Amino acid sequence: MPALSTGSGSDTGLYELLAALPAQLQPHVDSQEDLTFLWDMFGEKSLHSLVKIHEKLHYYEKQSPVPILHGAAALADDLAEELQNKPLNSEIRELLKLLSKPNVKALLSVHDTVAQKNYDPVLPPMPEDIDDEEDSVKIIRLVKNREPLGATIKKDEQTGAIIVARIMRGGAADRSGLIHVGDELREVNGIPVEDKRPEEIIQILAQSQGAITFKIIPGSKEETPSKEGKMFIKALFDYNPNEDKAIPCKEAGLSFKKGDILQIMSQDDATWWQAKHEADANPRAGLIPSKHFQERRLALRRPEILVQPLKVSNRKSSGFRKSFRLSRKDKKTNKSMYECKKSDQYDTADVPTYEEVTPYRRQTNEKYRLVVLVGPVGVGLNELKRKLLISDTQHYGVTVPHTTRARRSQESDGVEYIFISKHLFETDVQNNKFIEYGEYKNNYYGTSIDSVRSVLAKNKVCLLDVQPHTVKHLRTLEFKPYVIFIKPPSIERLRETRKNAKIISSRDDQGAAKPFTEEDFQEMIKSAQIMESQYGHLFDKIIINDDLTVAFNELKTTFDKLETETHWVPVSWLHS
């Protein structure tokens, strides 16, 4: 039989061979019927398509591309769920329809299987009909690649056995579905582990690459798949598992910063939850302290740290009569609407750990969210607010404060102040109608809740600056406040940028402006540090006022995003 011509191109050789076969085989075919059959078979479109697929896979194998992510199917489900909460247009409807098609779901599932290399054969579990006197043994082979196994182990103090203590959601062990909490580990890659410490076994696993073979004795009870709905939390503190002596496995811990959004994957353990960062496409979870555990140990570890309302020096009583005008807060004495009934220790009862949150986007017919500005005296908060008001008087508004002071000839009721009697003011205080109030020279000044409602009712963004301990009481379904902390730059930058600026002085009755002093700078920095330390978990945004123009532009950009983009808010705001 003569040699067959296969063509010169290596990538298209098989395709050319297929096309040449009928002619090459013709001298060896006895009947015309057989020859016709060969021509029809090798000319079949489906066969040509299979050859093309083969060539594509051969090229893919040569390139060895690395998958961008391992959980495309889960990402598509999350995207579809997210789109359901968006205003539907033709493009979104088309995308939702596409993502719901079985063939697209199957394609993404196959992609994930290939990306995770989850196609190697795994030995099935041993049959259940084994002598009750003998322990049933399972031999499991997992492909770990470079990722952690996703399980923690411990030594049983009574029996000395090595037990699977925890399965991390989304990890290799979890995806296999073959290893469960309570299983006893006997061998790893043929190495007996009965007499080894957990640390030694971890080293064996860390040094193993590719396939790992386990010999295990199943526990008495296997985990049932969790059917919990998705739960998202906002972290209210920084966490580094490497600095946590209590965590059972530092390598399994998940680091996060204050303000990060985490998705809770499992709450089966009352002490250690499993979570992942919300924006992380990697499905593998990590350990974080549970809310109850973190609250308990913080309360025991730091009972001396009590969150007290910031004390304001006498120098800051400057312009107190003006403090509520444009909602300025350089007050000598002020109280929140809750402080008349609750002691200063009310703030200490709350240990900031986590807050359950949900996505929220303002609808066009909704009132604007209340914008709360917080910052130390002299940081430039009022100047930023003034620039905002000037930039768009139809869009931004401020509250008109109440006072018991006598109206002056050039003043109009309801413009500079709302003038009321002392008796009525005190009655409103008792009825908790004031967000904040204070007294200066035997006259009351205060910002009422109704004044905030009045601005919002005009379809305006209400700009309100308050003392930081008041913020928590404004966090309600009605106002949905967005809290911005205006932070000073370093003291070196303050000396450089504020050398010609002035601050309102209290050294004369008129509250005249005076140049900043070194003491002003130091007190501004110290006050900002205390605010951020005690109330930073309530801040949605931090803007450093190094340069006024830059800070103003950042503030404007923040407002634009606040009104058009999706943000995370407490669940209670939408489901109460």
From Swiss-Prot:
**Domain PDZ, first and last residues per copy:** 139-220
Domain L27 spans what residues?
10-65, 67-122
Residues found modified as Phosphoserine = 409
Q: How does it sit in the membrane?
A: Peripheral membrane protein
Compartments annotated for it: namely: Membrane; Lateral cell membrane; Cell junction, Tight junction; Cell junction, Adherens junction
Q: Does the keyword Transport apply?
A: no
- Transmembrane ranges, per UniProt, are none
- What residue spans carry the region label Phospho-regulated basic and hydrophobic (PRBH) motif? 289-383
What's an example Gene Ontology biological process for this entry? establishment of cell polarity
Q: PANTHER family recorded for this chain?
A: MEMBRANE-ASSOCIATED GUANYLATE KINASE MAGUK
> Quaternary structure per UniProt?
Heterodimer; able to heterodimerize via its C-terminal L27 domain with LIN7A, LIN7B and LIN7C. Forms a tripartite complex composed of DLG1, MPP7 and LIN7 (LIN7A or LIN7C). Interacts with DLG1 via its N-terminal L27 domain. Interacts with PALS1 and PATJ.
Name of this protein = MAGUK p55 subfamily member 7
